[in-house]
Structures are given as C-alpha cells and as structure tokens.
C-alpha cells in the first residue's frame, strides 16, 4: 500500500505532475528518430568503439566489408583517437559508413559511488544494437551485428548472395561458421601487404 504522504499524483488532461517532498524527479525528452526506409541489401551494426586506437584493425575491417558488398556500416562511437576520427569522417562523407555518437550515461547523483555505467553490460552494447536494429529492420534484407575485430568472409564474394543461399532452406534453425584467430604485431603491419597476401578459398 502506497503512502500518500510521500508522493501525490495529480491527473490532468494535458499533463501529469509528480509532487514529492523526498525525491526530485528529472524529466528528459527522448530524441525521436525515424526508421530508415531506403532499401538496402546488407547492413552492419558495429558495437561501440571505446578508447579506440587500433587503426590497423578498423580500416581493414571497413575495406573488407566494403569489398564484399556491404551497403552500409553503422559504426557506434564512444571515443577514438582524433586522427582516426578524421579519417572515419571522410568515409562517412563519401557514404561508405554511418557514424553514430554513443555517449556514456551521465551521473545525475553527486555521489561518486553511484555510476550507472557500471551496471551496463559491455558499455551498453545491447542498447546500441537494438537502436540499430529498429533503425534498419524495415530497410535492410539482412543485418549483421558484429564487433570491430570480426570479419566475415563470404564464399560467393558477396554477403547478399551468401545470405540468400542460406535462407533458401526453411527448416534450418541456425548456422555455424568456421572461425580463425589471426593476429599480426602492429609494428609489422602493412596495409597493402594485408590485401596482397590474403586469398579467399572455397
């Protein structure tokens, strides 16, 4: 049973006011975004970049997905190096990627022990992926939810063709992919050498 001395709710036709002698309630207006309606074959939703500095991984990631026909790469950004951001903005300017600012939650309370970000899993990754899903689900035929260190190589040289082949079987519940871990020391990394030495096999 609620105590009417603590909180009183007054209903009106146009607004609702909350009155309390104990708790101050802040009301924030949530931004409203329209869903993308442009028809796209394949879109990727990339987990938020946080304190990101590994440019070798990032630009290899973007170029490989571009090469195999990804229509749009929606990259969520919390924080990256300034020079990396400048290059990303050039990619966005030419329509290759979409940059989505993704800020950490602010602490409304002055108590430093209370941090809402500590209650979020993987820097609020799930919320970013859900936003991307609702933004593109009416537009894209296929949506990839991926991290910046994950590169999917299609067998037909086209993501869209691969996914279409997979969906022809209506009695399959899930798919498994061969997974390889590759790592090159940053001091030995050459961007052009990466593309010259990699070969795609069936």
Task: Go through the PLM ranges and name each one.
Residues 61-72:
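Short, acidic, metal-binding catalytic loop of nucleotide-sugar glycosyltransferases
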């Amino acid at each position: 049973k609620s105590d009417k001395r603590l909180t009183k709710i007054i209903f009106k036709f146009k607004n609702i006011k909350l009155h309390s002698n104990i708790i101050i309630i802040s009301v924030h207006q949530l931004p409203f975004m329209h869903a993308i309606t442009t028809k796209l074959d394949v879109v990727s939703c990339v987990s938020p970049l946080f304190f990101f500095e590994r440019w070798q991984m990032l630009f290899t990631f973007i170029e490989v997905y571009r090469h195999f026909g990804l229509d749009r790469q929606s990259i969520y950004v919390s924080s990256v190096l300034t020079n990396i951001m400048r290059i990303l903005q050039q990619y966005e300017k030419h329509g290759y990627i979409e940059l989505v600012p993704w800020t950490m939650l602010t602490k409304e309370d002055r108590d430093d022990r209370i941090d809402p970000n500590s209650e979020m899993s993987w820097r609020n990754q799930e919320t970013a992926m859900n936003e991307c899903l609702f933004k593109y689900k009416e537009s894209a035929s296929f949506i990839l939810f991926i991290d910046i260190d994950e590169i999917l190589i299609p067998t037909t040289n086209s993501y869209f063709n691969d996914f279409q082949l997979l969906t022809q079987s209506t009695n399959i519940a899930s798919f498994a992919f061969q997974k390889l871990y590759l790592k090159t020391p940053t001091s030995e990394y050459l961007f052009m050498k990466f593309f010259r030495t990699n070969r795609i096999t069936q």
